[in-house]
A protein has these predicted regions:
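Phosphate/nucleotide-binding beta-alpha loop and adjacent structural elements of enzyme active sites
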Residues: 1-223
Length: 223
């Protein structure tokens, strides 16, 4: 399945060769990573696109969910996210310029100079990776409270190394039973072993369904 005909020009930040846009579009539309979860969508629930980047997943899911909340802390990527939503006349996605983490407040944020897509609260293991900005953070239970979220059918979690900390946190435990399914990406370079993420998910009532591809995308569903 290729991107739909009504997918218009995509705004992105940086050089095309430094981005994973082609890979991401193939993953979403051709490989259909999110397609198996569409039948699980329950009326009145929302989707959370955490680490929305330029909004490709939000664009895809906007056709199926009544409401999507998209978090993206990077200034440049957030600008592109907004432009892509406006350019495609998407009105059911709420973009929020924050990072999801285990505590709120401002924190240093950065990444390697040759990869404009890779931005993280963690220092990646590349020689030139450095923090070059400060971003506002929010915990997941505070996000639920602020946005009055009752139920999440799908949580997309791509937080560049913070996934284990988030899923292991007390704030996640407080809302875990309101989440039906998680599609996320593992980042072993954060210093966490993959089994720590698996254990945290299981402790919060999720079962690991499968690893989807070589990008270490995982699927976890509520037991």
């Amino acid at each position: 399945m290729n991107p739909p005909d009504d997918l218009r020009a995509i705004f992105f930040y940086g050089k095309l060769e430094d981005n994973w846009i082609g890979h991401q579009m193939a993953e979403i539309w051709k490989d259909g990573v999110y397609r198996p979860f569409l039948p699980l969508i329950k009326e009145g629930t929302v989707a959370l696109d955490i680490g929305a980047n330029i909004g490709l997943v939000s664009l895809y899911l906007s056709k199926y969910f009544e409401k999507i909340i998209s978090l993206e802390p990077s200034e440049k990527h957030f600008e592109c996210l907004n432009k892509n939503l406006v350019g495609h006349n998407i009105t059911n996605v709420k973009p929020i310029k924050k990072a999801l983490f285990i505590k709120g407040g401002p924190l240093p944020f950065g990444g390697p100079s040759d990869n404009t897509t890779m931005r993280s609260l963690h220092t990646a293991p590349w020689q030139d990776s450095k923090s070059d900005a400060t971003v506002e953070c929010i915990t997941i239970d505070k996000l639920f409270e602020d946005e009055k979220i009752e139920r999440v059918s799908l949580l997309k979690l791509d937080v560049e190394g913070s996934e284990t900390e988030i899923v292991s946190s007390d704030s996640f435990a407080r809302v875990a039973d309101k989440i039906d399914c998680i599609v996320g990406e593992r980042h072993a370079w954060s210093g966490r072993h993959p089994h720590q993420l698996d254990d945290a998910l299981k402790n919060n009532g999720f079962s690991i369904e499968k690893i989807l591809n070589d990008a270490n995308l995982f699927v976890a569903k509520r037991k």
